[in-house]
């Protein structure tokens, strides 16, 4: 102890009896700090020693009945460097050193200067990005479609060319063929004797108007309502 006092101008010893808190400690006023403890107060005394010691000052930790691994861990966690065991008796001693750092000191951070401007999204709409709708149309799109006839639309039975509807026709071809037959029957026939309009008494056996009432020339196939008797 005397050798340490001669070596260092300002030296202090911390024991578990020291009840001073971190707020009461005067920071960085000692050239050397000695800690003597049984172990339970080791963590608290190491924090106080870090505040009391000046940068690059020496700290000796003297402990008893404390596991060596725990001592080394606590000393490093407190911030001390270059931990070395100097005594392996009942009282074990460890020397360490406070780094060249002042308590509460600030260190400037050298950040790279970004001269390049950050890319900003360009929300301006460019005309080049717009698509001309006329370019999407092809030549065949301008051709007027041909309207299909009614008979072509009804060509579901596959028998339009033969003019024969199927047995159970549901597409309407059977009705078309039947209506064409009725129209053909109502078309004026050619008279061979010239007496068709006079009545059945003057008509020949092959007259197309057989059974119809007499009519004037040009009124073939027409029935006058006044000639029909109400039943």
Curated annotation (Swiss-Prot):
<feature type="binding site">
    <location>
        <position position="157"/>
    </location>
    <ligand>
        <name>[2Fe-2S] cluster</name>
    </ligand>
</feature>
<dbReference type="GO" id="GO:0005758">
    <property type="term" value="C:mitochondrial intermembrane space"/>
</dbReference>
<feature type="short sequence motif" description="Cx2C motif 1">
    <location>
        <begin position="193"/>
        <end position="196"/>
    </location>
</feature>
<feature type="region of interest" description="Linker">
    <location>
        <begin position="113"/>
        <end position="143"/>
    </location>
</feature>
<keyword id="KW-0411">Iron-sulfur</keyword>
<keyword id="KW-0479">Metal-binding</keyword>
<comment type="function">
    <text>Component of the cytosolic iron-sulfur (Fe-S) protein assembly (CIA) machinery. Required for the maturation of extramitochondrial Fe-S proteins. Part of an electron transfer chain functioning in an early step of cytosolic Fe-S biogenesis, facilitating the de novo assembly of a [4Fe-4S] cluster on the cytosolic Fe-S scaffold complex. Electrons are transferred from NADPH via a FAD- and FMN-containing diflavin oxidoreductase.</text>
</comment>
<feature type="binding site">
    <location>
        <position position="193"/>
    </location>
    <ligand>
        <name>[4Fe-4S] cluster</name>
    </ligand>
</feature>
<feature type="binding site">
    <location>
        <position position="171"/>
    </location>
    <ligand>
        <name>[2Fe-2S] cluster</name>
    </ligand>
</feature>
<feature type="binding site">
    <location>
        <position position="166"/>
    </location>
    <ligand>
        <name>[2Fe-2S] cluster</name>
    </ligand>
</feature>
<dbReference type="GO" id="GO:0051537">
    <property type="term" value="F:2 iron, 2 sulfur cluster binding"/>
</dbReference>
<feature type="region of interest" description="Fe-S binding site A">
    <location>
        <begin position="157"/>
        <end position="171"/>
    </location>
</feature>
<keyword id="KW-0496">Mitochondrion</keyword>
<feature type="binding site">
    <location>
        <position position="207"/>
    </location>
    <ligand>
        <name>[4Fe-4S] cluster</name>
    </ligand>
</feature>
<feature type="region of interest" description="N-terminal SAM-like domain">
    <location>
        <begin position="1"/>
        <end position="113"/>
    </location>
</feature>
<dbReference type="InterPro" id="IPR046408">
    <property type="entry name" value="CIAPIN1"/>
</dbReference>
<comment type="similarity">
    <text>Belongs to the anamorsin family.</text>
</comment>
<keyword id="KW-0408">Iron</keyword>
<feature type="binding site">
    <location>
        <position position="169"/>
    </location>
    <ligand>
        <name>[2Fe-2S] cluster</name>
    </ligand>
</feature>
<feature type="short sequence motif" description="Cx2C motif 2">
    <location>
        <begin position="204"/>
        <end position="207"/>
    </location>
</feature>
<feature type="region of interest" description="Fe-S binding site B">
    <location>
        <begin position="193"/>
        <end position="207"/>
    </location>
</feature>
<dbReference type="GO" id="GO:0051539">
    <property type="term" value="F:4 iron, 4 sulfur cluster binding"/>
</dbReference>
<dbReference type="GO" id="GO:0046872">
    <property type="term" value="F:metal ion binding"/>
</dbReference>
<protein>
    <recommendedName>
        <fullName>Anamorsin homolog</fullName>
    </recommendedName>
</protein>
<feature type="binding site">
    <location>
        <position position="204"/>
    </location>
    <ligand>
        <name>[4Fe-4S] cluster</name>
    </ligand>
</feature>
<dbReference type="InterPro" id="IPR007785">
    <property type="entry name" value="Anamorsin"/>
</dbReference>
<dbReference type="GO" id="GO:0016226">
    <property type="term" value="P:iron-sulfur cluster assembly"/>
</dbReference>
<keyword id="KW-0963">Cytoplasm</keyword>
<comment type="subunit">
    <text>Monomer.</text>
</comment>
<dbReference type="Pfam" id="PF05093">
    <property type="entry name" value="CIAPIN1"/>
</dbReference>
<keyword id="KW-0001">2Fe-2S</keyword>
<feature type="binding site">
    <location>
        <position position="196"/>
    </location>
    <ligand>
        <name>[4Fe-4S] cluster</name>
    </ligand>
</feature>
<dbReference type="GO" id="GO:0009055">
    <property type="term" value="F:electron transfer activity"/>
</dbReference>
<keyword id="KW-0004">4Fe-4S</keyword>
């Amino acid at each position: 102890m005397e050798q340490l006092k001669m070596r260092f101008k300002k030296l202090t010893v911390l024991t578990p009896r020291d009840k001073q808190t971190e707020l009461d400690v005067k920071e960085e006023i000692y050239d050397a700090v000695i800690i003597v403890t049984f172990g339970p107060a080791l963590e608290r005394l190491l924090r106080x020693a870090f505040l009391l010691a000046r940068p690059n000052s020496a700290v000796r930790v003297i402990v008893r009945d404390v596991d060596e691994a725990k001592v080394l861990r606590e000393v490093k966690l407190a911030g001390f460097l270059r931990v070395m065991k100097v005594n392996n008796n009942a009282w074990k001693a460890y020397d360490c050193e406070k780094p060249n750092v002042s308590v509460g000191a600030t260190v400037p951070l050298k950040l790279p200067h970004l001269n390049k401007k950050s890319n900003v999204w360009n929300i301006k709409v460019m005309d080049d990005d717009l698509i001309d709708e006329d370019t999407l149309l092809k030549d065949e799109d301008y051709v007027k479609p041909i309207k299909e006839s009614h008979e072509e639309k009804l060509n579901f039975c596959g028998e339009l060319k033969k003019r024969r509807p199927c047995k159970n026709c549901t597409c309407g071809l059977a009705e078309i063929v039947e209506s064409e037959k009725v129209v053909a029957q109502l078309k004026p026939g050619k008279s061979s004797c010239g007496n068709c309009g006079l009545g059945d008494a003057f008509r020949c056996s092959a007259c197309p108007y057989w059974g119809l009432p007499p009519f004037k020339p040009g009124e073939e196939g027409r029935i006058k309502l006044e000639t029909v008797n109400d039943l």
